[in-house]
Amino acid sequence: MPDPLTREDLQQFIDANAITATILPLDAHTATVEDAARVLGVDTIQIIKSLLFLVDGEPLLVINNGTARVDRKQLAGHLGVGRKRVKFASADQALALTGYVVGSMPPFGHRLPLKTLVDPAVTALDTVYGGGGALDAMLRLTAAELLRVTGAEVAAIAEQE
């Protein structure tokens, strides 16, 4: 397997595609959404997760609010498939398909272009923070820029409380 992509690779992708986004280096890995929000001084709702699923073996990136869980039944229904056909990608599969280590995965700039869904709770925000291409980095951008760059479809896929 090739070496994992890095935040430098992400920065090159940002520069090459004229994306308005900033990679924020951190002093240490923030293992939880709460840690990331505290270190960045933002609300936990602004932290986003980029999660890789396999739908009948095909990769699908799902971007969700960091404090919410993806409802696989709802996701499957949106895609028009049975829930059992939607699997969460393993860490090895995610690395192979995106190039990034789980916990550092940005919402774009992957090894392969990925079909992407974004939950409306994310698009309702102005500024969001996601994986920055390294365990000790976060990416800051607007939700509008996130949608523009990913070409994502907005779909309600978060578990409702």
Task: Cite the ranges covered by each PLM segment.
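Extended, low-hydrophobicity, polar/charged segments
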Residues: 1-161
